[in-house]
């Protein structure tokens, strides 16, 4: 191996193995139904918050309207209640948790989920929390608390942060520049 090849290999071994690719950005919807229930997607027994990916330069709020469609008058989004991200080997996976206005059971009956294999169900909040995987459970608990307090919560790698991290960039808010990539599955759960 030549000296140049060895030098390049040594640099690659020391370089951080992260953010080689643009982040995957997704949305999860927190849909309150009445005072004690949530609407969830049920994919053959696996419960999850309704979610989907955001396309290049698409705002999370716009992506949310592709996740659930069909309610009379459209889906009324209140605000972003949480931003959850994890650093994988090559990119960040960022999920925006958006809360909708409270819905009635009748209105939820008109919702159509983007994945035809899943059905939208209304379940008691406690049952939803028990039935979700760990990451989804954290998003629901923190999202509900943030909705109640009027704050936005920040979750990094499964840890709730006390405040917004100083390095938030526009790409985190769905305003990515350059670099392609299709929508990801960041929002599942």
Label each region the model flagged.
Residues 41-45:
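C-terminal lobe/hinge of AMP-binding adenylation domains
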Residues 54-77, 84-137:
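Unchanged
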Residues 13-17, 23, 40, 84, ...:
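Residue-level detector of functional hotspots within protein domains
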Residues 30-32:
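Short hydrophobic alpha-helical segments used for membrane anchoring or interfacial signaling
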Residues 47, 113-189:
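Nudix hydrolase/Nudix homology domain
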Residues 1-28:
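Acidic, metal-coordinating catalytic segment for phosphate/diphosphate chemistry
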Residues 48-52:
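A short gly/proline-enriched turn/hairpin at secondary-structure junctions
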Residues 36-38:
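Entry beta-strands of beta-propeller and related beta-repeat scaffolds
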């Amino acid at each position: 191996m030549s000296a140049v090849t060895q030098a390049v290999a040594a640099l690659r071994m020391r370089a951080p193995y992260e953010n080689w690719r643009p982040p995957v950005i997704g949305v999860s919807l927190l849909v309150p139904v009445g005072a004690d229930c949530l609407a969830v997607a049920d994919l053959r027994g696996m419960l999850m918050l309704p979610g989907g990916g955001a396309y290049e330069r698409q705002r999370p709020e716009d992506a949310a309207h592709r996740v659930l469609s069909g309610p009379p008058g459209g889906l009324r989004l209140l605000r972003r209640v949480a931003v959850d991200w994890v650093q994988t080997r090559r990119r960040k996976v960022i999920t925006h948790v958006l809360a909708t206005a409270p819905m009635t059971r009748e209105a939820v009956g008109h919702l159509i989920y983007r994945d035809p294999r899943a059905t939208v169900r209304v379940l008691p909040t406690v049952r939803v929390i028990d039935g979700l995987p760990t990451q989804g459970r954290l998003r629901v608990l923190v999202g509900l608390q943030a909705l109640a307090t009027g704050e936005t919560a920040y979750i990094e790698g499964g840890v709730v942060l006390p405040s917004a991290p100083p390095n938030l960039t526009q790409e985190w808010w769905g305003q990515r520049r350059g670099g392609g990539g299709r929508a990801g599955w960041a929002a599942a759960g």
